[in-house]
């Protein structure tokens, strides 16, 4: 395998679709989300885990209850294998799961929510975060499997881990959905460097995290 082209081909890195459980656990690890203690807060613990199991079901993984004795189709069903995790409904619910995590959504318990503002402040240097484009490139290193040689220039992205078109999509979701300012990137820099419009900053980061995750 390691001598074969498929074993060393960069295009194959990050190519397997994660199970809903992989997606959930990986996201919680990245953001250091902790469940309430099952010994000191059992009610909250079981409420939270019950909600997470419900989310897994919505994303296509009936936890410990596969449809047949062979297990989950994604692990054995030729020829689709891991693609079995994706259907129109399952994909929509994956998007919705992330949206609930990063937004102020009452359906997601407080201990399980992600605070995008705190994450950027704690993980990204101030000067990097103040520039919308360098912020996106830096976040890609956390969120995406391939983040080398990233550029927003469509004429210079041949060796990039992501296309410039994809990065520009993230930029549009970040600052132009909706566009609040004539110069969105300059306005982002002002808002990040100064304690003004914190709610706008939060909403824009929520949009960015939702698009990238």
Protein language model regions, located:
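Flexible, low-complexity segments enriched for small/polar residues
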Residues: 1-213
């Amino acid at each position: 395998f390691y001598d074969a082209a498929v074993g060393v081909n960069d295009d194959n890195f990050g190519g397997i679709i994660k199970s809903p459980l992989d997606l959930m656990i990986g996201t919680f690890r990245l953001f250091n989300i902790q469940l309430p203690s099952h010994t000191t807060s059992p009610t909250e613990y079981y409420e939270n885990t019950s909600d997470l199991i419900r989310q897994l079901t919505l994303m296509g993984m009936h936890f410990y209850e596969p449809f047949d004795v062979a297990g989950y189709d994604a692990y054995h069903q030729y020829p689709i294998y891991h693609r079995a995790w994706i259907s129109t409904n399952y994909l929509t619910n994956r998007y919705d799961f992330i949206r609930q995590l990063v937004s102020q959504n009452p359906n997601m318990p407080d201990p399980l929510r992600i605070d995008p503002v705190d994450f950027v402040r704690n993980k990204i240097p101030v000067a990097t975060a103040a520039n919308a484009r360098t912020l996106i490139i830096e976040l890609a290193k956390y969120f995406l499997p391939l983040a080398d040689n990233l550029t927003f220039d469509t004429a210079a992205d041949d060796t990039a881990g992501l296309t410039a078109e994809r990065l520009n999509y993230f930029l549009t979701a970040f600052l132009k959905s909706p566009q609040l300012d004539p110069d969105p990137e300059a306005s982002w820099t002002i808002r990040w460097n100064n304690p003004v419009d914190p709610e706008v900053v939060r909403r824009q980061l929520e949009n960015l995290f939702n698009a990238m995750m």
